[in-house]
Amino acid sequence: MYKISELIKGELCFFPELGYGFYPVPPDRPYDENYFEKYQKLADTEMGREITQSRMDLVNRHYSGELCDVGIGCGQFVESMGCYGYDVNSSGIEWLKKRNKYRDIYRAPVGALSFWDVLEHIDEPEKAVAMAKEWVFVSIPFFESAEHITGSRHFRKDEHIHYWTHEGFIRWFSLNGFSCEEFNDAESEIGREGIRTYAFRRVRNANQITTS
């Protein structure tokens, strides 16, 4: 006998009514020096520079103040924007500390946080966005169904834990106290596949949020 409760521990679960999917990524993840170097190569291209500029433009349309980029990739956005950064990759942490740009977002709230292709990697994303006092900026793959997820290049069993539909993502942020002020497909138009970018503004404090 094979229990459903055991099956779902190793497979994608998708909840259409929530617009949300979950994959149990193992704790041993590939965030090391090679990972950092891979993103250095991706950033040092015309497309990489266009994407960074698009992200800067999004932030600047809505916010001016203290910003921390969570999951810095190779640091291109941090360097271009002149903001702080947070990472779990030792290479990223070292890069930030050398430039006096490291900020542990879980120690104290920050005016705004950015998560460029990052939120889907975080085990408890609600704890991360809770540390934003005013704004959260995100780029993330979006999906329509479980079949869309499993057929996508963004279905990464060693990295991506969370999978949202567009509606599910906005709903999830609303439940966490944020209003969607803008979304666009600029990164997909530049050449990426199935990526949407969002600007969320805090409208309720964490202690005002209920689960009812």
Predicted segments — roles?
Residues 122-123:
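Helix-to-beta-strand junctions that scaffold the AdoMet/dcAdoMet cofactor pocket
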Residues 116-119, 139:
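Residues lining the SAM
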Residues 134-145:
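Conserved beta-strand signature within the Rossmann-like core of class I S-adenosyl-L-methionine
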Residues 1-112, 116, 126-131, 149, ...:
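Conserved N-terminal segment of class I S-adenosyl-L-methionine
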